[in-house]
């Protein structure tokens, strides 16, 4: 049974620093630009609407104040998690159009809620040209959530972003796979020390995009499912310069298409988000058109007649359970997924200039300097926990659990296959 795609716009730019003192980042225009090139019609997707972000206004924020726009990002993340949860409750496959990488906080919150509801962990496949792993423990400055999103969703950083609703971390380090960072990423050793699995561009290219997607899936075999984050700056600036921090040494559109198709061609993939495309640097719309072509082809397995949706059904409204303490979830002993057997290397002609060290969104001349983060709070921080949709429960598996009682069947398309 095919899975219906639902496209939700999340046009926030709150996680980026202003390109100049008198302008705002343009990535908030990305959903409109992609829609203008026929994305929804070509995907035959349901229009899930737009979650309008708060105004981009740094106000009197100064270096040393922590992450800029933190209260606004926190509240927006709760609302975005509600919307993503509602899509999943309908048995649909969410495609979230950012916006900057701070949208990952809302997606991560939705996945943590889901994992809690089904009694399992949800993983993250993080496809990005940068590790976005800057945090107070490894840097003298922070300030832009879009350059710190992976750190925040793994529980590092100020509590009003890293522990929304008292949930921390949203993803465990062992449940994260990072693909597409540059070979000299500034925080690659920190990722390794944290136990976060990575495959930089040279290794991704050597193994091939299809095998890399399968390998990523195997790394998360112990999870109930996974979310896919795609920052288009994973692409080489020779083919995709319309981003806030272009960095040489990226992949090609064809590789991204194959990678995306492999990641979503399983009921374990719960949804995808696309971030950081900036139409202000796409004067003729050609890059938007190329992104649409790639996304449509890459998501083809989702809407294939043979696609199998996850095995989850939405219950009635469920209020979040109280979460006492400082928001740090109790650790559970979990064995890591077995590593995949490496496949023979496949030679691929590299594109663009030679690799250079990753500057983590900060040395681009269009950007301002950052600031030091504030200390973590001891108690849960952020907005009031949502009571909206997105709470899902397990349904019986044939030859495993007892059959469902009459009347428990959910909407069409919600019979799934998440282990």
Where are these regions (language model features)?
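Conserved alpha-helical scaffold segments that buttress catalytic/binding sites
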Residues: 3-419
């Amino acid at each position: 049974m095919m899975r219906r795609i639902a496209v939700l716009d999340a046009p926030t730019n709150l996680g980026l620093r202003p390109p100049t003192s008198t302008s705002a980042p343009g990535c908030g225009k990305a959903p409109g630009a992609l829609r203008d090139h026929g994305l929804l019609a070509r995907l035959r997707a349901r229009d899930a609407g737009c979650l309008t972000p708060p105004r981009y206004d740094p106000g009197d924020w100064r270096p040393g104040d922590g992450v800029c726009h933190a209260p606004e990002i926190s509240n927006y993340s709760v609302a975005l998690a509600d919307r993503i949860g509602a899509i999943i409750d309908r048995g649909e496959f969410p495609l979230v159009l950012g916006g900057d990488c701070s949208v990952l906080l809302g997606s991560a919150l939705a996945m943590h809620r889901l994992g809690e509801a089904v009694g399992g962990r949800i993983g993250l496949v993080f496809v990005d040209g940068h590790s976005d792993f800057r945090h107070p423990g490894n840097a003298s400055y922070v300030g832009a959530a879009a350059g710190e999103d992976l750190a925040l969703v793994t529980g590092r950083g100020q509590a009003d972003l890293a522990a929304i609703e008292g949930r921390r971390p949203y993803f465990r380090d062992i449940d994260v796979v990072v693909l597409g960072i540059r070979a000299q990423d500034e925080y690659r050793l920190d990722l390794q020390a944290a136990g976060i699995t990575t495959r930089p561009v040279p290794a991704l290219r050597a193994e091939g995009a299809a095998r890399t997607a399968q390998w990523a899936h195997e790394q998360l075999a112990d999870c109930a499912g996974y979310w896919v984050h795609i920052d288009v700056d994973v692409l080489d600036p020779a083919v995709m310069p319309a981003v806030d921090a272009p960095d040489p040494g990226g992949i090609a559109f064809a590789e991204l298409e194959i990678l995306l198709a492999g990641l979503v061609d399983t009921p374990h993939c719960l949804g995808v988000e696309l971030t950081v495309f900036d139409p202000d640097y796409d004067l003729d719309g050609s890059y938007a058109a190329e992104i649409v072509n790639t996304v449509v082809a890459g998501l083809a397995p989702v809407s294939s007649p043979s696609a199998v949706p996850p095995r989850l059904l939405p219950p009635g409204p469920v209020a979040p359970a109280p979460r006492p303490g400082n928001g740090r979830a109790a650790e559970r002993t979990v064995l890591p997924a077995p590593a995949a057997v490496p496949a023979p290397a496949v030679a691929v002609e590299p594109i663009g200039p030679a690799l250079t060290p990753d500057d983590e969104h900060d040395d681009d001349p269009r950007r301002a300097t950052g600031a030091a983060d504030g200390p973590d709070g001891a108690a849960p921080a952020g907005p009031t926990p949502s009571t909206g949709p997105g709470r899902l429960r397990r349904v019986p598996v044939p030859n495993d659990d007892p059959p469902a009682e009459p009347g428990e069947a959910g909407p069409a398309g919600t019979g799934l296959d998440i282990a």
